Design a protein with these regions (language model features):
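Long, charge-rich boundary regions
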Residues: 1-2, 104-115
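Short loop/turn motifs enriched for small/polar and acidic residues
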Residues: 32-36, 65-69, 108
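Short functional micro-motifs and their immediate structural scaffolds
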Residues: 79-81, 95-97
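Long, charged N-terminal interaction/targeting segments
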Residues: 1-58
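Flanking scaffold residues of small Cys/His-coordinated metal-binding clusters
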Residues: 67-68, 82-83, 100
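Short cysteine-rich clusters marking metal-coordination/redox-active sites
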Residues: 73-74, 88-91
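Cys/His-enriched microdomains
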Residues: 71, 86, 103
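Short, intrinsically disordered, charge-biased short linear motifs at domain edges
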Residues: 58-64, 72-79
Length: 115
């Protein structure tokens, strides 16, 4: 289950993002997971729940935004949904994956602890 290593990489990003704010705690992580990112969303949620306490994020919640795959013609820019032929019907150019292939940390919401 590579989702565990992806969750640890996510926490590494969060560590770097909140380092300038030592008196804060991450409360919400919003992550975009693409349809073709090779990630099982439910396994990712399970890995997050299982790893967050050991990384010091026991109070953090996870919100996932799914992203549909979208292909774009390299020649003319026409877009295609997943499942369509990967050759442009407009110009016969080849399509490339434009969206839906990544995992992106979109936002970290912090709670600032009074000192």
């Amino acid at each position: 289950m590579h989702e565990v290593s992806l969750v640890h990489a996510l926490f590494d990003q969060v560590d770097r993002a909140i380092a300038p704010h030592p008196s804060s705690a991450a409360r919400l992580l919003i992550v975009r997971i693409g349809e073709l990112a090779g990630v099982e969303t439910e396994l990712f949620r399970t890995a997050f729940a299982g790893c967050k306490a050991e990384r010091g994020y026991q109070a953090a919640m996870l919100e996932i935004e799914p992203e549909a795959a979208e292909w774009r013609c390299a020649e003319c820019g026409a877009t295609f949904p997943t499942g369509a032929p990967l050759q442009c019907t407009r110009c016969s150019g080849f399509a490339r994956l434009f969206a839906g292939g990544d995992i992106i940390l979109l936002r970290v919401e912090l709670e600032v602890v009074d000192v």
